[in-house]
Amino acid sequence: MLPDSYYREIDALAELYEASIGRLASAQVLDRAAFGRFRDAITSFLTQSKAHSVVPKRALLLVNTSANFCKSTAEFSEDREFIAEFGTFMTRAFFLLASGEDFDDRQPGVPRII
C-alpha cells in the first residue's frame, strides 16, 4: 500500500493540472508560472515514485492527458513553441513514470548501461 503522502502529492498534481492545462483548455489563458509549478511538481513526483513499485492510474492519466492536450493544442496556440515543449516534457515524464525512472536517470548522448 502506498503512503498517504503519495496520494496527497497526486491531489496536488491534479490542482496544478487545473491551474495550468485546465485553465488553458477552458479560458484560453496561458499562465506560464502555473505551467512552471506543474513542471516542478511532476519532476518531484517522478523522483518520489522511484521508491514505489506501483503508480496509481490517476497519476498516469494526469501526465498522459497533459501531454496529449499540449500536443493537440500547440498548433493553435499563440505560443506554439512553449506548449509543444511542455507536451514533449510531459510525454517523456509519462514514459519515465511508467518505467520507474526520473529525469536524472538518463543523460542525452551517453549510452545506457544496465
Give, region by region, the residue ranges found by the protein language model.
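Alpha-helix C-capping/helix-to-loop hinge sites
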Residues: A27, F45-S49, T73
